[in-house]
């Protein structure tokens, strides 16, 4: 597996992921790129799960973004519908974390599209560790989104054997003023 974390703070959103690819208990690759920019660099996406499955889903998601002129939520819902109902897609095992300048979403193979509380996403084998770390950093520090994502991935990498310290980090700055969380 892997760890993907997405943090939104002060008009910036970051999706970061480690680079480890495992086959059973063996590390096959340490520098995989599991975070990408899509749709003219306006959407960030990261995956946890099977690599080949995730690349298939990236392609499908990007085509949905094109179809819906970059509208993240519509594209995510359409992908989730296809993923749940298409016999071939249904067998794909991966989770997607996606974000644009206004929304952060988790897309699952069960047909779920979830906008998490506080726009914090952490998925994959080290996701619980990264989420706990990122939550603590969001609530108790003034670190920016990138620093929180990096630190939470490092903590997950120290604990989870399926997460390493080779990170890919992508960041978007929002021009849209978002309401402050209460």
Swiss-Prot record:
Q: What class of enzyme is it?
A: hydrolase
Pfam families for this protein: Proteasome
Q: How is its activity regulated?
A: Allosterically activated by HslU binding.
Q: Which residues form the active site?
A: 2
Which PROSITE patterns does the entry mention?
PROTEASOME_BETA_2
- Where is Na(+) annotated to bind? 157, 160, 163
* Origin: domain of life: Bacteria
Protein family: Belongs to the peptidase T1B family. HslV subfamily.
Its biological purpose is as follows: Protease subunit of a proteasome-like degradation complex believed to be a general protein degrading machinery.
List, alphabetically, the HAMAP family matched: HslV
What name is this protein filed under? ATP-dependent protease subunit HslV
What taxonomic classification does the UniProt entry list for its organism?
Answer: Bacteria, Pseudomonadati, Pseudomonadota, Gammaproteobacteria, Vibrionales
Gene that encodes the chain: hslV
């Amino acid at each position: 597996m892997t760890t993907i974390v997405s943090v939104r703070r002060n008009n910036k959103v970051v999706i970061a992921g480690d680079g480890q690819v495992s086959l059973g208990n063996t590390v096959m690759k340490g520098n995989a790129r599991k975070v990408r920019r899509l749709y003219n660099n306006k959407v960030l996406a990261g995956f946890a799960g099977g690599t080949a499955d995730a690349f298939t889903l990236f392609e499908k998601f990007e085509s949905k973004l094109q179809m819906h002129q970059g509208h993240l939520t519509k594209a995510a819902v359409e992908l989730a519908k296809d993923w749940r109902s298409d016999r071939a897609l249904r067998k794909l095992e991966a989770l997607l974390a996606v974000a644009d300048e206004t929304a952060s979403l988790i897309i699952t193979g069960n047909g779920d599209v979830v906008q998490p509380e506080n726009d914090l996403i952490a998925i994959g084998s080290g996701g619980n560790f990264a989420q706990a770390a990122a939550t603590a950093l969001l609530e108790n520090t003034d670190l920016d989104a990138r620093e929180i994502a990096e630190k939470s991935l490092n903590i997950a990498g120290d604990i989870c054997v399926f997460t390493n310290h080779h990170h890919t980090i992508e960041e978007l700055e929002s021009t849209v003023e978002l309401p402050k969380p209460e």
